[in-house]
Amino acid sequence: MTRVERGRVLARAIERAVAHRASARRWTTTTRTPAWMVTGWMGGRGVDRSTAMTRFERCGSTASSKITAAPMVYVRGEEMTAYVMDLIRSRWIEPRVDVGGWETFDLRAKNRDDTEDRVLRDVIEAGKRIKAIFKEPTVTPTADQVKRLGLRKSWGSPNGAMRRGWNGITISRDTIHIDGVELGYKKPVLFERHAVGGEYSAGYKNVGKGKLTTTFTPSEGPDAGKTVVVDEREIVDEEAAVVTYHNPYDNVHDLARFFFGRCLEAKVTPYVVTKKTVFKWQEPFWQIMRTVFDEEFKAQFVAAGVMKEGEELVHLLSDAATMKLVQWRQGGFGMAAHNYDGDVLTDELAQVHKSPGFITSNLVGVHEDGTLIKEFEASHGTVADMDEARLRGEETSLNPLGMVEGLIGAMNHAADVHNIDRDRTHAFTTKMRTVIHQLFREGKGTRDLCGPSGLTTEQFIDAVAERLDA
């Protein structure tokens, strides 16, 4: 598929997603799922496949009025966030939704070790097939955790493998807003972080004094097979690190279309962020973004009243973007950046907007057929310190909103992609979000927003469950 054809297919996919038009294809599979892929949800204890299927069948057979959840990949994590998601599934979801179509994978560090990371490879394959994924926060083990958990090695973050496996183009991180509750930004802020390339896929070696030569051998074209020198330098330090990485630009066209399409839908002003004055190799990122905007979106932004006639797409240096995120508290803008800059800037975005718990995180990839693969998760980690307090018997108060927004996004996307019980799924997820927002407005939320009088983790879960029944 050529880049132009790919762009057209992606544009159609984005239009379908924005308009919420569902695919007519119903998901089916005859794939046999290994027993170790499925885990128990309460307390993190593993169960075999037959036990899990018995539970699924029981969910679907006892209440015909239950919503039928569309096929979705559910990735289990660990520590405090896994505990809270266990509660949410048992108290909010499973009494009302038949989740028999979900494929659940145990991505805890111990299971990755036990399966030699086969579970991660199976998650990626399932994600390609099903196209809708929810992932709980997971642990990337430190050296101390490797010893404590009895692991054979320090397994790397699964995120990079997922981004590559699903042909990731962007990680979307947006502000979450609750009417009547003051957070950071008054209006929505959208952020697109290039999902691949940069330091995250780097190779490195610790070295001493010597000569460093970086070479490249083209695999096609007139110079195929001929090695060329990219860089050559003397290292004079006794201790140094040599790092190599590359930035792929083929999928920046897809990133641009997705970013500008979302900004247009939300009616917010787009900005492109680089450090191209210093890092000259970042220039193509800006040029591609500007070309796609000028040729495909500029007139639409003017027609929608988001930009004025003659107004150009604005480039921001990453230094300036850092300041603008603090200054533009009114919100109403979008930014797109390289992988590393996007990582740093979205951390700042989260702090301005109260905490990472009020930021969404959505990996968007493109299937080989041109349709979108979407993986949803919280933008924060496993909250290990709070889990340690819970295990000591202390009260905790974890705000689950970021994780719930991820679950809502995954369930809605699954229903849209597979066209299964779509209307009831959207109605249920909307009610779930509405109830959470109501409780926060009434001062009955978790303590990060409601102070010492706020509810504990378990009290908040129960409060939402009661209103879902109302």
Curated annotation (Swiss-Prot):
InterPro entries: Isocitrate_DH_NADP, IsoPropMal-DH-like_dom
Activity versus pH, per record: Optimum pH is 8.0 with Mn(2+) as cofactor and 8.5 with Mg(2+) as cofactor.
Protein residues bound to D-threo-isocitrate: S157, P158, N159, G160, A161, M162, R163, R193, Y200, K275, D319, D343
Cofactor: Mg(2+); Mn(2+)
Any one biological process term the GO annotation gives: NADP metabolic process
Activity control, per UniProt: The homodimer exhibits allosteric regulation by isocitrate.
Interval spanned by the transit peptide: 1-26
Any one Gene Ontology cellular component term annotated for this protein: mitochondrion
Thermal dependence of function as given in the entry: Optimum temperature is 45 degrees Celsius.
Subunit structure: Forms homodimers.
Designated name of the protein: Isocitrate dehydrogenase (NAD(+)), mitochondrial
Source species taxonomy: Eukaryota, Viridiplantae, Chlorophyta, Mamiellophyceae, Mamiellales
Gene: IDH
